Amino acid sequence: MNKIDFIEMEQMKKNIPVFRPGDTVKVHVKIVEGDKSRIQVFQGVVIGRQNGGIRESFTVRKISNGIGVERSFPLHSPSVDAIEVITRGQVRRAKLYYLRKLRGKASRIKEKKYVAGM
C-alpha cells in the first residue's frame, strides 16, 4: 500500500450503510449559513453510484411539488452527516436514469421481499 492509499483510507468514513441503486434513502446534510449550521434531510431514490474509494459519490432523486429534483452527494464528505436506508428497491440496472422520463405511478420501484428466519 502506498502513501496515497494510506491517507485515503484514514479519511474514509466507517459508518456508511450498504445501499444500492433503487433504494430509498434519507441523507442528512450539514448546511452552514453564516456562523450557524443545521442539518437538512433529503429523501429520495438512489439512481446511481459513481467512482469508488474516497471519490465515491451517489445521486438521489425525489419529486418535490411535481418537479423532479436530483442531488449528488460525495459519500465520504464531512457535510454528509448520516445516511439512512428506508426501503430496499428491486431493480435490474446500475444507473436508473430512465426514471427521469417516467411520471406518476410509472416511476415506482418494486420493493425487495425478505424471508425472515432463513
UniProtKB/Swiss-Prot annotation:
GO terms for molecular function: structural constituent of ribosome. PROSITE patterns: RIBOSOMAL_L19 (PS01015). It comes from the Bacteria. Gene3D superfamilies: 2.30.30.790. GO terms for cellular component: cytosolic large ribosomal subunit. Keywords: Ribonucleoprotein, Ribosomal protein. The keyword Ribonucleoprotein applies. Transmembrane segments: none annotated. GO terms for biological process: translation. Belongs to the bacterial ribosomal protein bL19 family. This protein is located at the 30S-50S ribosomal subunit interface and may play a role in the structure and function of the aminoacyl-tRNA binding site. HAMAP family: Ribosomal_bL19. This is Large ribosomal subunit protein bL19.
